[in-house]
From Swiss-Prot:
Protein name, entry field: Vesicular acetylcholine transporter unc-17
Protein's organism: Caenorhabditis elegans
GO cellular component: AP-1 adaptor complex; AP-2 adaptor complex; excitatory synapse; neuron projection; organelle membrane; plasma membrane; synapse; synaptic vesicle
GO terms (BP aspect): acetylcholine transport; chemical synaptic transmission; nematode larval development; regulation of locomotion; regulation of muscle contraction; regulation of nematode pharyngeal pumping; regulation of neurotransmitter secretion; synaptic transmission, cholinergic
Lumenal, vesicle compartment segments: 53-101, 152-160, 214-219, 287-303, 357-367, 413-418
Cell location: Cytoplasmic vesicle, Secretory vesicle, Synaptic vesicle membrane
InterPro entries, per the entry: MFS, MFS_dom, MFS_trans_sf, MFS_Vesicular_Transporter, Multidrug-R
Annotated transmembrane regions: 32-52, 102-121, 131-151, 161-180, 192-213, 220-242, 267-286, 304-328, 336-356, 368-388, 394-412, 419-440
GO MF, any single term: acetylcholine transmembrane transporter activity
Topological type in the membrane: Multi-pass membrane protein
Family, similarity comment: Belongs to the major facilitator superfamily. Vesicular transporter family.
Effects seen without this gene: Newly hatched animals are small and coiled, do not grow or feed, can barely move and die within a few days.
Source organism superkingdom: Eukaryota
Length: 532
């Protein structure tokens, strides 16, 4: 017997046995997997965005940059006692290479994530989903703790890059685990939609979370909180480890996933990957540039309102996830149309952003942008799992590594490209480019209409081929009337009889060395005699 648990007044061993029994049920396992993966994705995106309000000010406070003073002039005044007071006024402080160093610090996580993802997908396909996820979450715990305690730019850059290494394992294995546990199409779409909602929530709640805690308790506190949540989530993964889930195939051999390079060659997967990149380019372009544009075009906007401009669009994003899941259930063969509408909607909304003149007006196109992103992500991520199921091997590590690479490409190079475009051509040109690229890529998704029809035709073709092969086999062709044996009837005969318990053929009958049921003929049968 264990100890008595206070409040609920129950023995600890009984509670442990009840919890184990509850976890052994498949539906409860699925719920736990979804909660664990959603928390992991929430943490990863919070770590990506929480530094936005903290690090620029922190690097200035620790005197990380060389400083020059520009535009100052002396102003002299005489006090009543005859003392002259000289002040420098009218200038500004220039922090040398600030944008460059901030850009590398922001992009280092996504850049390393791009390079690690091919290896993480390969490892996940070989060893399963749970252990790589634990590795990724533990790496995120250590890297975030280092980031919390680091006091120099070099240490912060190292910790930030290490976060990308952990995210490459945690994100990919999390999405693959959902696809592996939720095998039914509608169920998988709903689960991935919930995970995507947590991704969006992490991106939107992280800046206010970091800003408030940084102002109240200093830099280490928000990062230490996130690091210990990472550790707790890694411990929770041990509850859902199922080492026997990915076993062997019908021949007793371990199932091997399709190599990533071969998945890249699949035109349907390549089309989905491109759409995921285009969907996230808008956010990757707008997030680092819209604040500066608002300060120029809407100078009377309070600073706190600029910081929470992305919070209202979170609700349309959740609504988009819900609508997409419902539409996929009603129109399962029109996934491509939902994604096409979302991409076009996103581009048109970006085109309208530069023409807004108030915060309330700006919220409307941003809401449509997030709604369109929800349509694209929620429809295409389940399709990646479906493509692997129908065209490759049902091992999901590499295909969701491709999805993670798509996100990382957008967020690694998006801020750099957007900054260059805004500097040379302006913010309006940036949004026109987003509109043009999204609307141009949207018709490409029309190629995905063949995904489900290909699956149907392939199944019919396989059945017809099996029927033809069995029709030409010697099982039923010796009586002059070839008998077609379908794959189902042949499999059913194998299930009912084993090779050792076949019906014994009399000695005077003609026997054939074949494992399937044979026709029996009377003694003296001559197949070449036309009398027979």
């Amino acid at each position: 017997m264990g100890f008595n648990v206070p409040v609920i007044n129950r023995d600890s061993e009984i509670l442990k046995a009840d919890a184990k029994k509850w976890l052994e049920q498949q539906d409860n396992q699925k719920k736990c997997v979804l909660v664990i993966v959603s928390i992991a994705l929430l943490l990863d995106n919070m770590l990506y965005m929480v530094i936005v309000p903290i690090i620029p000010k922190y690097l200035r406070d620790i005197h990380n940059y060389q400083v020059t003073f520009e535009g100052y002039h002396n102003e002299t005044s005489q006090l009543a006692n005859g003392t002259y007071l000289v002040r420098e006024v009218g200038g500004r402080i220039n922090f040398l290479d600030e944008e460059l160093e901030l850009g590398w610090l922001f992009a280092s996580k996504a850049l390393l994530q791009i390079f690690v993802n091919p290896f993480s997908g390969y490892i996940i396909d070989r060893v399963g989903y749970e252990i790589p996820m634990i590795l990724g979450l533990c790496t995120m715990f250590f890297s975030t703790a280092i980031f919390a305690l680091g006091k120099s730019y070099g240490v912060l850059l190292f910790a930030r890059s290490l976060q990308g290494f952990g995210s490459a394992f945690a994100d990919t294995s999390g999405l693959a685990m959902i696809a592996d546990r939720f095998t039914e199409e509608n169920e998988r779409s709903a689960a991935l939609g919930i995970a995507l909602a947590f991704i969006s929530f992490g991106c939107l709640v992280a800046p206010p979370f970091g800003s408030v805690l940084y102002s109240l308790a200093g830099k280490p506190v928000p990062f230490l909180i996130l690091s210990f949540v990472c550790l707790a989530d890694a411990i929770a993964v041990f509850m859902v480890i199922n080492p026997h889930r990915r076993g062997t195939d019908s021949h007793g051999e371990k199932v091997q996933g399709t190599p990533m390079w071969r998945l890249f060659m699949d035109p349907f997967i390549a089309c989905c990957s491109g759409a995921l990149i285009m969907a996230n380019v808008s956010l990757a372009f707008l997030e680092p540039t819209i604040t500066t544009w608002m300060s120029e075009m809407m100078p009377d906007t309070p600073g706190w309102l600029v910081g929470v401009i992305w919070l209202p669009p979170f609700f349309p994003h959740v609504l988009g996830v819900y609508v997409t899941v419902k539409m996929l259930r009603a129109f399962p063969h029109h996934t491509w149309a939902i994604a096409m509408v979302g991409l076009a909607m996103e581009g048109i909304a970006c085109f309208a952003i530069p023409y807004t003149t108030s915060v309330m007006q700006l919220v409307i196109p941003l809401s449509f942008v997030c709604f369109g992103i929800a349509l694209i992500d929620t429809s295409l991520l389940p399709m990646l799992g479906h493509l692997v199921d129908t065209r490759h091997v049902s091992v999901y590590g590499s295909v969701y590594a491709i999805a993670d690479i798509s996100y990382s490409l957008a967020y690694a190079f998006g801020p750099i490209i957007a900054g260059w475009i805004v500097t040379n051509w302006g913010f309006t040109a940036l949004n026109i480019i987003i509109f043009a690229t999204n609307v141009t890529y949207a018709p490409v998704l029309f190629l995905l209409r063949k995904v489900h029809s290909y699956d149907t035709l392939g199944a019919k073709g396989d059945t017809a081929e099996m029927t033809q092969l069995n029709s030409s086999a010697p099982a039923g062709g010796y009586n002059g009337k070839p008998e077609a044996t379908t794959a189902e009837s042949y499999q059913g005969w194998e299930d009912q009889q084993s090779y050792q318990n076949q019906a014994q053929i009399p000695n005077h009958a003609v026997s054939f060395q074949d494992s399937r049921p044979q026709a029996e003929f009377p003694a003296g049968y001559d197949p070449l005699n036309p009398q027979w």
